[in-house]
């Protein structure tokens, strides 16, 4: 007769929870960048004007090569949310998500 040992294994779904936290924080920061900070930045630029170098606005200093590169970064977003904005806010969202995961699993419980 063989004895069956009871295992103390614990089944968790950490992978799904991790994916959800990273996705939710990335989506939240993309929405924050698109609907909060982009209009704020546009209103500040319209209020204070574009930066100048030697009295010439930076929009006049754009060469043909720069125009070609800038056309690749444009999107069809009505507000003008560019590819660089998506990458930057997405990276911030990932950083916030990893911060949440790191602080949630470090074992410190300061509220006890």
Curated annotation (Swiss-Prot):
Recorded hits in InterPro entries, A to Z, give: PSI_PsaG (IPR017494), PSI_PsaG/PsaK (IPR000549), PSI_PsaG/PsaK_dom (IPR023618), PSI_PsaG/PsaK_pln (IPR016370)
Q: Where are the transmembrane segments?
A: 20-40, 81-101
What are the protein's UniProt keywords?
A: Chloroplast, Membrane, Photosynthesis, Photosystem I, Plastid, Thylakoid, Transit peptide, Transmembrane, Transmembrane helix
Keyword Disulfide bond found: no
Q: Which GO terms describe its biological process?
A: photosynthesis
Disulphide bonds annotated for this chain are none
The UniProt entry, under PROSITE patterns, shows: PHOTOSYSTEM_I_PSAGK
Kindly give the membrane topology term recorded for this protein: Multi-pass membrane protein
Pfam families according to UniProt: PSI_PSAK
Protein location: Plastid, Chloroplast thylakoid membrane
CC per GO annotation: chloroplast thylakoid membrane; photosystem I
Give the stretch annotated as transit peptide in the record, renumbered to this chain.
Answer: 1-15
Primary site of residence: plastid
Annotated family:
Belongs to the PsaG/PsaK family.
Its biological purpose is as follows: Not yet known.
- Supply the name of the protein: Photosystem I reaction center subunit V, chloroplastic
Source organism of this protein record: Syntrichia ruralis (Great hairy screw-moss)
